[in-house]
């Protein structure tokens, strides 16, 4: 049987050659568990006449990836094979690749179609010796297989459909795209990114150095006007933003409700639902950057709006299709007054913004005064018990995970932009809280630090974290100036306020590396100190930039200009890790260059590239699927797998148990308690702890955070108590998604069917819902009246005799 080599020559398939190639890439791996011969045997069995060496390499990489559940080193080997394969197909020298990308001619039109901007091309050519020699290609081999495949699929630039960049080329392109002629800063950024200390957000990785460098992730839009012109002008603006890979949060509080009078036509309004359906179709049509990811809009509405009950139905899977818009995401911008009325079981009045103007433009006591004034003047459309509205919110969340919950008064009260005006909404992922208006589209550029990379010899290196965050802050500040803005309103806003968003990834991995169970005192302290370090470093860097470039335009009158920082607004004292008094003196003297700095975002794609868990989330499972173009691969939490291999507990039987138990190790008797404590999944961690951690880091987050809530068996009582707990803790984002576990598990492959049947019988019993009646727990397969009566204190009560009924404290 013959194989085609890269130069087109034919050669006989040689078992030994394949084994030797795989063996060469096994350096530093555990030779007791990683077997090159076994991989070669599986590759040979898939060979067909005329196969190319590129296809052989792909097959070898995927074969190694399927064996990851045997030992975590197989994931590293799979990546090495895939990276080595790419290296053989691409140019080595960075400046040569930049030249190829810049000089590209579209074969269909025969016209130049450069993928690198003239400015960046000129800089690279001018400094090519320095830039070419700074790149260390071995760092490509530090990615795991799935991280590398994510890069290959969406991030590395292509010529005629073939990948032209290596990961190191992409990182250097991003560094030069941000820093331009400042080669020293570009190489510093390259080194930190290539060593996995931090990463910029996806749009920055996609577009830096290209002719249209749209590097921002988030845009916050306010409707231009409640008119056909205003609605469609705003729609066009959203399309232009989405076209260049921006996610959008749009507030629609000021759009008149169904049945409102329209003076221009002497007719009545159809309300927000038909309008949202138009926006929904735009989100579907305008994808982000040539199918890299679909367009995404989140609509924000305050709960006093007369159409809010229809708004809550829009994402549901059943009902009249004319009243559904499922590609949009939905969020509530909730004033404290609404929460208070739900808690006190009082009436809630709905208004049309055309008949009761100005409610979206005020917050706090001013909002309460205006809302109650309109109530007294009988301007309301109708009123309902606030708890009935609350029930509709919960029902929608259980069915769809939406609407997101953000607390308007906390977002405004604790914002460094409160001197600019009332903040009307957040973004698509609920972590950006910035001022927007009809003539200002708020923008945010994001980056995240990889928390596990700062662990050395079992200790957390806060000084290194501080140093790296200062570099990232300077980068994000530079992006504001080099960025391409899809609409002028975005440029105006970003130049006036200069906000940036620093986030994290891999907090759960950092806990694993330091052997800290998620709910331990050590983890609680580390969570606070990490975010305190990030906030301090970002402020210090921003202050140092202000010394040279001056403060941002709207600085005067901001809380920071009066010596008030985020933790002051929370009435919290920081730890003694950093000298805050000295920093406040510096800020009083020089000011800061950026109005906002810290915003932990979901990091869904970039954390997959670096091989860490998302943002600050616990692991959702110790066994999960990773999908690449060639198929799905089963992955075991690499930290757990390493521990089980070291303790000689990992075998096929253990793997089957893990699959059978949905990635949980709590019911596996052979696994010792210290590992059970360390590797609890998010479903096994008290959500009260998750909310506590969010509140603990809140004083050092001047924007907000993408906080998901996970509930295994959601009941209206549990969700209610969580929302109220988060609201009373002072969170700005009370909830991003509500994540619930499917009642029926997916099909379990490679599992002993007898064992599975026994497990399913047990879980059927467990899934019956516990309900409290007259202080006693009863089991019911159906939700009862008491369970739906979310305001009945007994349902919310915590009972030591009935721990399963309360998920807030895990009893």
From Swiss-Prot:
The record marks 736-737 as: Important for electron transfer. It is an enzyme of class 1 (oxidoreductase). Disulfide bonds join 218-444. GO terms for cellular component: cytoplasm; cytosol; ribonucleoside-diphosphate reductase complex. One of its GO terms (molecular function) is ribonucleoside-diphosphate reductase activity, thioredoxin disulfide as acceptor. CDD domains: RNR_I (cd01679). Its EC number is 1.17.4.1. Gene3D superfamilies: 3.20.70.20. DTTP binds at residues 226-228, 243, 256, 263-264. It comes from the Eukaryota. It catalyses: a 2'-deoxyribonucleoside 5'-diphosphate + [thioredoxin]-disulfide + H2O = a ribonucleoside 5'-diphosphate + [thioredoxin]-dithiol. The keyword ATP-binding applies. GO terms for biological process: CDP metabolic process; dCDP biosynthetic process; deoxyribonucleotide biosynthetic process; dTTP biosynthetic process. Heterodimer of a large and a small subunit. Interacts with SPD1. This is Ribonucleoside-diphosphate reductase large chain. It comes from Schizosaccharomyces pombe (strain 972 / ATCC 24843). The lineage of its organism: Eukaryota, Fungi, Dikarya, Ascomycota, Taphrinomycotina. The gene is cdc22.
């Amino acid at each position: 049987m013959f194989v085609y080599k890269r130069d087109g020559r034919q050669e006989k398939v040689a078992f030994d050659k394949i084994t030797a190639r795989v063996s060469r890439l096994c350096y530093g791996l555990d030779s007791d568990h990683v077997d090159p011969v076994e991989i070669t045997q599986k590759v040979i069995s898939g060979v067909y006449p005329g196969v190319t060496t590129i296809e052989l390499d792909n097959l070898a990489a995927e074969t190694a990836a399927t064996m990851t559940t045997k030992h975590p080193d197989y994931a590293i080997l799979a990546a090495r094979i895939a990276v080595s394969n790419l290296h053989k197909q691409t140019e080595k020298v960075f400046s040569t690749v930049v030249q190829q990308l810049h000089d590209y001619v579209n074969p269909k039109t025969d016209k130049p179609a450069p993928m690198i901007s003239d400015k960046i091309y000129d800089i690279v050519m001018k400094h090519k010796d320095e830039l070419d020699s700074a790149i260390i290609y071995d760092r490509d081999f530090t990615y795991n297989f799935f991280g590398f495949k994510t890069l290959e699929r969406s991030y590395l630039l292509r010529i005629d459909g073939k990948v032209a960049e290596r990961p190191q080329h992409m990182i250097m392109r991003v560094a030069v795209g941000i820093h331009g002629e400042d080669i020293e800063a570009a190489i510093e950024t390259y080194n930190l990114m290539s060593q996995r200390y931090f990463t910029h957000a996806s749009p920055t990785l996609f577009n830096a150095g290209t002719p249209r460098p749209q590097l921002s992730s988030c845009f916050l839009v306010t409707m231009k006007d409640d008119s056909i012109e205003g609605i469609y002008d705003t729609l066009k603006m959203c399309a232009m933003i989405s076209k260049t890979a921006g996610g959008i949060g749009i507030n629609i509080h000021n759009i008149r409700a169904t049945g409102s009078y329209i003076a221009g036509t002497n007719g009545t309004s159809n309300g927000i639902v038909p309008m949202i359906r138009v926006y929904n179709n735009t989100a579907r049509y305008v994808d982000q950057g040539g199918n890299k990811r679909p367009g995404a809009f989140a609509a924000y509405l305050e709960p006093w709006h007369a159409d809010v009950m229809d708004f809550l139905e829009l994402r549901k899977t059943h009902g009249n299709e004319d009243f559904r818009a499922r590609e949009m995401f939905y969020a509530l911008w909730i004033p404290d007054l609404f929460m208070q009325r739900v808690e006190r079981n009082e009436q809630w009045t709905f208004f049309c913004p055309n008949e009761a103007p100005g409610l979206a433009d005020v917050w706090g006591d001013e909002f309460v005064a205006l809302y109650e004034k309109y109530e007294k003047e009988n301007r309301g459309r109708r009123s309902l018990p606030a708890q009935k509205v609350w029930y509709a919110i919960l029902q929608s969340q259980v069915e769809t995970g939406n609407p997101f919950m953000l607390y308007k008064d906390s977002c405004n009260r604790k914002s460094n932009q409160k001197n600019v005006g009332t903040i009307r909404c957040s973004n698509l992922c609920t972590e950006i809280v910035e001022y927007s208006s009809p003539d200002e589209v708020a923008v945010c550029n994001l980056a995240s630090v990889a928390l596990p990379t700062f662990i050395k010899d079992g200790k957390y290196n806060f000084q290194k974290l501080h140093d790296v965050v200062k570099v990232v802050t300077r980068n994000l500040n530079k992006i504001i100036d080099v960025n391409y803005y899809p609409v002028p309103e975005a440029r105006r806003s970003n130049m006036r306020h200069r906000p940036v968003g620093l986030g994290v990834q891999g907090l759960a991995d950092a806990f694993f590396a330091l052997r800290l169970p998620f709910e331990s005192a050590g983890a609680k302290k580390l969570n606070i100190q990490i975010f305190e370090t990030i906030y301090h470093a970002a402020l210090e860097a921003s202050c140092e930039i202000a010394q040279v470039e001056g403060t941002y335009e709207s600085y005067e009158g901001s809380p920071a200009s009066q010596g008030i920082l985020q933790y002051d607004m929370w009435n919290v004292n920081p730890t003694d890790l950093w000298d805050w008094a000295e920093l406040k003196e510096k800020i009083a003297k020089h000011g800061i260059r950026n109005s906002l700095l810290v915003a932990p975002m979901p990091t869904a794609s970039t954390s997959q590239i670096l091989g860490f868990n998302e943002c600050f989330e616990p692991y959702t499972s110790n066994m999960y699927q990773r999908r690449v173009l060639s198929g799905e691969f089963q992955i075991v939490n690499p930290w757990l797998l390493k521990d089980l291999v070291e303790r000689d507990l990992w075998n096929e039987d253990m793997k089957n148990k893990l699959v059978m138990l949905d990635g949980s190790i709590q019911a596996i008797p052979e696994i010792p308690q210290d590992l059970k404590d360390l590797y609890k999944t998010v479903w096994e961690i008290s959500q009260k702890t998750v909310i506590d951690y969010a509140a603990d880091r809140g004083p050092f987050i001047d924007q907000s955070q993408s906080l998901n809530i996970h509930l295994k068996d959601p009941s209206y009582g549990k969700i209610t108590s969580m929302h109220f707990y988060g609201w009373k803790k002072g969170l700005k984002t009370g909830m991003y998604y509500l994540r619930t576990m499917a009642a029926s598990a997916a099909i379990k492959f490679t599992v002993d069917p007898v064992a599975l049947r026994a497990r399913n019988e047990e879980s059927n019993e467990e899934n019956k819902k516990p309900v409290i009646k007259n202080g006693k727990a009863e089991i019911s397969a159906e939700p009862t009246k008491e369970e739906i009566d979310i305001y009945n204190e007994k349902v919310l009560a915590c009972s030591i005799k009935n721990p399963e009924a309360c998920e807030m404290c895990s009893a």
